[in-house]
Amino acid sequence: MAEFNIDELLKNVLEDPSTEISEETLKQLYQRTNPYKQFKNDSRVAFCSFTNLREQYIRRLIMTSFIGYVFKALQEWMPSYSKPTHTTKTLLSELITLVDTLKQETNDVPSESVVNTILSIADSCKTQTQKSKEAKTTIDSFLREHFVFDPNLHAQSAYTCASTCADTNVDTCASTCASTCASTCASTCASTCASTCASTGASTCADTNVDTCASTCADTNVDTCASTCADTNVDTCASTCADTNVNTCASMCADTNVDTCASTCANTCASTEYTDLADPERIPLHIMQKTLNVPNELQADIDAITQTPQGYRAAAHILQNIELHQSIKHMLENPRAFKPILFNTKITRYLSQHIPPQDTFYKWNYYIEDNYEELRAATESIYPEKPDLEFAFIIYDVVDSSNQQKVDEFYYKYKDQIFSEVSSIQLGNWTLLGSFKANRERYNYFNQNNEIIKRILDRHEEDLKIGKEILRNTIYHKKAKNIQETGPDAPGLSIYNSTFHTDSGIKGLLSFKELKNLEKASGNIKKAREYDFIDDCEEKIKQLLSKENLTPDEESELIKTKKQLNNALEMLNVPDDTIRVDMWVNNNNKLEKEILYTKAEL
């Protein structure tokens, strides 16, 4: 097969567009421009499923970072409906002028013009402040509806820690407790300190430092607490994690620290003193304060250092470690460079306080799916990056995985023709894709821990199942509200939608029967549900009556359905703010049903 020059071929085509190109030349051109090698087609077919978990993670990462940014920007934003009459600078200037004017006044009472000017400035500032508060309240309400889970508004929280804790094994739970629950460990030490002191002995407690008790408990008992967690029944730990309110847990973790728990520990053991094992040469703070002989020029600095145990421990640690002096000096000279590094955990705490509802992910994902082609075209025209989140795959062959020789032969036969990494996939099982050389080890590892994969895939499948139901319920409630406010749809609207909106993304989410019953109930969701149930009962009765001979079970089902239908018809007359109670009264040895209504607590 003769080689050809692409530039020459392109030149000939541009000069004479009618030039015919042979099939062989087109094949060579395709092979030169296509980076993926092709193999001979096979008559066998492999069925497979694939889900892009990497893209799902990136979407969640983007959503999380976006939420943190929006809430932070809201805190720092000062809305401006119009240019403010008084800024801080102009207000200060005017107040200085007023003070000078008051000094020049000869009378004790300031002039009426001065008083009116002050009141005008105060009213202007008050108005601007009130507008700012109202704007922030409105925006905060909007953000919380979309980005903060509320069980009264949303179906499910995006926070999955509880379910993860329930499924995680003992070792994972122990390591998690060890790394994230320092404050909990400290508080646990506080509650058990009395028994520890008792077992240690009164004489030991008397000679031990109170202030160092807390830090010792907080610093030395984390591992003990972790091992205790590891020995604790997993189901109990899981149920506790699942039952604990997530937001409360997050705020507690964010607000509580080891030092706070340390002080609690110190207060609990007020009658005892502990030795700081990490710094045994340091004089206890309360003893040092009794024997201080401080020169006058150092009194202010010493008072500031010894005001809290934390400040005293920090100063003592720096003095005892000469190698820190130069670094501390650099830090004090350039605090802006060190603060973001040493206090970056505050960002994580702030982000963890705003947990979005799962509904937001569903709405966002639905918008992307419904406008996917348009979004791709817009993205490619705006940004230089190409879509790299999609995957293409090719099946080369199917061999017996038990025959390792055939697997190796295939690899060595085509290794020079395949530019990309080769992965082995076992049919009938989910497999995480990896390079051929390391795939066997990774495959064995994930099969030994296949519960990890199962949880990820089960979670993804569960999200897809309930996503449509959440969207359908949202549309159902919005449609009911629309009917209450504006009435039913115009008669020709259904014909228009069927003609022009055949590709609408929400088509089919609400059935014709549901829309009809919503209009029949004037947007009252409670009555619309009753109408749906009545239609189902009537359809079921119609099907049973259409049969010539009913079985005993079908006759019982018919009687039961008729009773349910009658009860549903009666429920239509029950007001929304009341509860119906059926009562049976003995009337001349005959039971008669009476209906009682009681007001519902809304």
From Swiss-Prot:
One GO cellular component term, please give it: host cell cytoplasm
- Compartments where located: Host cytoplasm
28 X 4 AA tandem repeats of [CNG]-[AV]-[DNS]-[MT]: region residues: 161-272
Which portions of this protein are annotated as coiled-coil regions? Answer: none
Question: Which sections of the protein are sequence repeats?
Answer: 161-164, 165-168, 169-172, 173-176, 177-180, 181-184, 185-188, 189-192, 193-196, 197-200, 201-204, 205-208, 209-212, 213-216, 217-220, 221-224, 225-228, 229-232, 233-236, 237-240, 241-244, 245-248, 249-252, 253-256, 257-260, 261-264, 265-268, 269-272
Q: Which domain of life is it from?
A: Viruses
Q: Which UniProt keywords apply?
A: Host cytoplasm, Late protein, Repeat
Induction pattern:
Expressed in the late phase of the viral replicative cycle.
Signal peptide location: none
What's its job?
Plays an essential role in the assembly of the icosahedral capsid of the virus. Allows the assembly of 3 molecules of hexon protein p72 and formation of a thermostable trimer.
The text of the family note is: Belongs to the asfivirus B602L family.
Name the UniProt record assigns to this protein? Protein B602L
Q: Which organism is it from?
A: African swine fever virus (strain Badajoz 1971 Vero-adapted)
- Mind giving the lineage of the organism this protein is from? Viruses, Varidnaviria, Bamfordvirae, Nucleocytoviricota, Pokkesviricetes
